[in-house]
Amino acid sequence: FALAHMVNDFEILKSYLDEGANGIESDITFSDEGEPEYTFHGVPCDCRRWCDRSVGIDEYLQHLSDLTTPGNPKFRENLLVVVLDLKLNGLSQDALRQGGLRLADKLAAHYWTGNRKARAYFIISVPKTSESEFMRTFRKELDEINFGDMSAKIGFDFTDNGDFKETQKVYEGLGISEHIWASDGITNCIPLLFRGTDRLEDLTRQRDEPGYKYIDKVYAWTYDKETSVVKALELGVDGVMTNYADFVIKVLNKPEHSSKYRLATYDDNPFEKFTA
């Protein structure tokens, strides 16, 4: 998956889809009470990016629905995965619970819109394991509003770069044992040399352990340099989040990589482990 980073308005969304990105990451902000409000990152953000793009959450989800519904004039076949990077810092546990509930409601009302034909997969990406109540109420609300079948299109991710053994315990407590993405990364402003790839290697090794069910996919963020992308591919990641989707795809298509990997299509389930 070539995951375009910080896609927070329609102009940049079109630009990345034109580059060939098959996934996007968007930042979702919340009120103090936990109401999802709009896409927005703000400063600081990645180097060489404009941090202030924004659109209202309802309008954003409706536009994504148009782009991912076959037969819609706006349909874009290559948009497969939407990572919702949830800006939850500072929210109380009550607000986290409200946030999970309300995001489920908004997906039902503005993305699936009753007919459930919009086909993108969503990754509910929570910053910290201490904010896991968001996931709990999100899942519960989908069932309560009779959208439980859409759980087949929902995955989960914690982005705190923490000890995954502890993360697994949180998933166990939530009753989540499938549709799990794991990630490791650092802002593009800091060279990968300072972050290293030890944890990324650990995640891919854990994913590939026979019978292990708490990691389906591993992705790296935010990789913009060829050396970093090549290293990620050598480690066997399933996705690279980037500010330059066309560049990542170009690297992927080089003969030394294309013999093993290709860009995912809708026939590839993002919640099934890939075996080369």
UniProtKB/Swiss-Prot annotation:
Cystine connections: 45-51, 47-189
Reaction equations catalysed: an N-(acyl)-sphingosylphosphocholine = an N-(acyl)-sphingosyl-1,3-cyclic phosphate + choline; an N-(acyl)-sphingosylphosphoethanolamine = an N-(acyl)-sphingosyl-1,3-cyclic phosphate + ethanolamine; a 1-acyl-sn-glycero-3-phosphocholine = a 1-acyl-sn-glycero-2,3-cyclic phosphate + choline; a 1-acyl-sn-glycero-3-phosphoethanolamine = a 1-acyl-sn-glycero-2,3-cyclic phosphate + ethanolamine
GO cellular component, one term: extracellular region
Catalytic residues (positions): 5, 41
EC number assigned by the record: 4.6.1.-
Gene Ontology molecular function: lyase activity; metal ion binding; phosphoric diester hydrolase activity; toxin activity
Record flagged with keyword GTP-binding: no
Tissue specificity of this protein: Expressed by the venom gland.
Superkingdom: Eukaryota
GO biological process, alphabetically ordered: killing of cells of another organism; lipid catabolic process
Keywords, comma-separated and alphabetical: Cytolysis, Dermonecrotic toxin, Disulfide bond, Hemolysis, Lipid degradation, Lipid metabolism, Lyase, Magnesium, Metal-binding, Secreted, Toxin
First-listed, main subcellular location of the protein, grouped into a coarse class: secreted
Cofactor descriptive note: Binds 1 Mg(2+) ion per subunit.
Localization: Secreted
InterPro entries reported for this sequence: PLC-like_Pdiesterase_TIM-brl
Binding residues for Mg(2+): 25, 27, 85
Enzyme superclass (EC): lyase
Family: Belongs to the arthropod phospholipase D family. Class II subfamily.
Biological role stated in the UniProt entry: Dermonecrotic toxins cleave the phosphodiester linkage between the phosphate and headgroup of certain phospholipids (sphingolipid and lysolipid substrates), forming an alcohol (often choline) and a cyclic phosphate. This toxin acts on sphingomyelin (SM). It may also act on ceramide phosphoethanolamine (CPE), lysophosphatidylcholine (LPC) and lysophosphatidylethanolamine (LPE), but not on lysophosphatidylserine (LPS), and lysophosphatidylglycerol (LPG). It acts by transphosphatidylation, releasing exclusively cyclic phosphate products as second products.
Name of this protein: Dermonecrotic toxin LspiSicTox-betaIE4ii
Species in which this protein is naturally found: Loxosceles spinulosa
